[in-house]
């Protein structure tokens, strides 16, 4: 189980590191052009706060558990990503993008598995 959780944590960290960097550095138009269409419904300050949340979560998925320093932050980061994915799914649903809603559901499920799995190991 530990190996599966590490794989999920690593995959989620890579995805959300990339997404967070994109949301923190790109213009609205460029994000939409590169596939980050869900941001269209939100003002840029919300997008930038989401970017910061994704970047912090990417680190929180790996570093606390790997170092043993405040390991409770790992399931907390995963739970935070679940909240982000609910917002993303809502946004893509409003934009009638079922494939993106499904992808958000997959990321939600992976983050939930990490949150529950790591919480059980505390």
Q: What are these model-derived regions, one by one?
A:
Residues 1-122:
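Membrane-interface extramembranous regions
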């Amino acid at each position: 189980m530990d190996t599966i959780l590490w794989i999920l944590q690593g995959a989620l960290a890579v995805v959300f590191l990339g997404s967070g960097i994109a949301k923190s550095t790109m213009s609205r138009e460029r994000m939409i052009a590169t596939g980050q269409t869900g941001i269209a419904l939100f003002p840029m300050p919300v997008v930038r706060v989401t970017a910061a949340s994704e970047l912090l979560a990417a680190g929180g998925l790996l570093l606390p558990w790997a170092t043993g320093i405040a390991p409770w932050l790992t399931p907390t980061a995963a739970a935070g990503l679940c909240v982000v994915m609910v917002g993303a799914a809502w946004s893509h649903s409003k934009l009638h993008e079922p494939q993106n809603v499904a992808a958000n559901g997959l990321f939600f499920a992976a983050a939930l598995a990490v949150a529950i799995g790591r919480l059980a190991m505390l």
